[in-house]
Amino acid sequence: ADFIRQHSASGQLVGRSVFLQPPYSVPETDLSVLLDVLCQDAINADITRVQGAEDVYFYSTQTMTANYADMCVQVVENDICRAIAEAVRFDGRTYPRPYKVAMLTQPPYSFESQQITAALTAMETHPDYADIRTVESSNAEPYLFSERFMSYGKAYGLCEWLEVEQYQNP
């Protein structure tokens, strides 16, 4: 549990597969029981799991939110398109606001600009991301928004305010 807490405090998940490898080398049958007990123990109530496509990941809710853990799963599993879409949809649903593309270069994502460009190109034709659209402010700062949560006009107005107009109004 402390191992998971330490990793969570530094913004990292712990994959289940870590415990199968040296130096831990916990047998599969023992590991399942151990992790189930760990997650159900009242003393370790902060330890929870999130299911990824490739592994199950563990983190402590004392230092990491479920949303951040979900973002980390997408980064660890290198699912850049899904990571971008989920970030855009989360901001649109929660705040609502468009998502600044430059934010994808920051932690927990830390994507390179080439990765972002390639992912956005792939997303343009993929049906799972049909709701994700681009919008640009008058100072040419790119943003993304989800048509599930806002129209192009609203996204444009908000990104224009964020990038230009708020600085022109005292």
Task: Kindly label every feature range from the protein language model.
Residues A1-P170:
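C-terminal non-catalytic scaffold/interaction domains in large multidomain proteins
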